[in-house]
């Protein structure tokens, strides 16, 4: 019979030890034994709470931006998948909350940003929230590392080459390799995007497809035949002082 006092003591000791480890180390610890796996599998445990409160900006924890990720562990994961301050146009900066990009009001420029982590395997979904005016062109989608992040003029930068795929929210057009690939979604009088709406981007690296959801409604597959390359969440914007947030959600739920 397990002594409940000893079990509680062991739990508290593990909690303290795991709180001082790096996140990569925690991943390795979860593979040591069933006991440690079950301990770390509690995504709202004090261990994940401690790491969440110490690594995430307080501003993001106080806002409703992370409403779609309910546990401490998923909030941490979203933070490490957010926009990269090192992989964006010089006219873009990432706000202190870590999840929102701000495009500076630079004339005759189109500017883009990529997420910190790209995907080549599995199925992934993330939310994009355009929190400022769209301007004449506002594109969300994916790109490889080779896709450009800045160009002259006000254009649909994302989707302008063979390294990027995008949905222009202003005109409801799909874009790739500099060509319009058709209207999207395929609905009669499809409603235009409203600022503040959450769009879910669904990347399936097994079926090589990209799809979108809005207001929990699946809008259909937008792109097929995606290459076997690492693909990154990406947006491109033209409007000065507009802001776009991105929250990684993990594996999409079917149904």
Curated annotation (Swiss-Prot):
Task: Tell me which family the UniProt entry assigns to this protein.
Answer: Belongs to the FBXO45/Fsn family.
- Tissue distribution: Expressed in nurse cells and oocytes (at protein level). Expressed in the brain. Expressed in the neuromuscular junction (NMJ).
Look up the domain of life of the source: Eukaryota
The F-box domain is annotated at 3-51
Q: Which PANTHER family does the record associate with it?
A: F-BOX_SPRY DOMAIN-CONTAINING PROTEIN 1, SPRY DOMAIN CONTAINING SOCS BOX PROTEIN
Keyword field:
Cell projection, Cytoplasm, Developmental protein, Neurogenesis, Nucleus, Synapse, Ubl conjugation pathway
Give any Pfam family that matches. Answer: SPRY
The record's subcellular location field reads:
Cytoplasm; Nucleus; Synapse; Cell projection, Axon
All copies of the B30.2/SPRY domain together span 61-253
Protein name, per record? F-box/SPRY domain-containing protein 1
Question: Biological process GO annotation list?
Answer: negative regulation of gene expression; negative regulation of synaptic assembly at neuromuscular junction; neuromuscular synaptic transmission; positive regulation of protein catabolic process; proteasome-mediated ubiquitin-dependent protein catabolic process; protein ubiquitination; SCF-dependent proteasomal ubiquitin-dependent protein catabolic process; synapse assembly involved in innervation
């Amino acid at each position: 019979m397990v002594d409940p006092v000893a079990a509680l003591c062991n739990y508290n000791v593990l909690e303290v030890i795991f709180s001082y480890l790096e996140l990569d180390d925690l991943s390795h610890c979860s593979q040591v034994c069933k006991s440690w796996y079950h301990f770390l599998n509690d995504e709202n445990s004090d261990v994940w709470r401690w790491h969440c409160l110490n690594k995430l900006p307080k501003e993001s924890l106080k806002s409703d931006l992370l409403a779609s990720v309910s546990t401490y562990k998923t909030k941490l994961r979203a933070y490490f998948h957010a926009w990269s301050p090192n992989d964006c146009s010089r006219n873009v900066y990432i706000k202190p909350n870590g999840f929102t990009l701000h495009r500076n009001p630079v004339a005759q420029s189109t500017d883009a940003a990529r997420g910190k982590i790209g995907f080549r395997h599995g199925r992934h979904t993330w939310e994009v929230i355009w929190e400022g005016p769209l301007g004449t062109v506002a594109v969300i989608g994916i790109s490889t590392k080779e896709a450009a992040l800045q160009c002259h003029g006000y254009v649909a930068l994302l989707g302008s080459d063979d390294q990027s795929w995008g949905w222009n929210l202003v005109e409801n057009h799909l874009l790739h390799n500099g060509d319009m690939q058709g209207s999207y979604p395929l609905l009669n009088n499809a409603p235009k995007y409203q600022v503040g709406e959450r769009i879910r981007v669904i990347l399936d690296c097994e079926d090589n497809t990209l799809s979108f959801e809005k207001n929990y409604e699946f809008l259909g597959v937008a792109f097929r035949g995606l290459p076997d390359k690492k693909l990154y969440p990406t947006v491109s914007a033209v409007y000065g002082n507009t802001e776009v947030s991105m929250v990684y959600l993990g594996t999409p739920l079917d149904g």
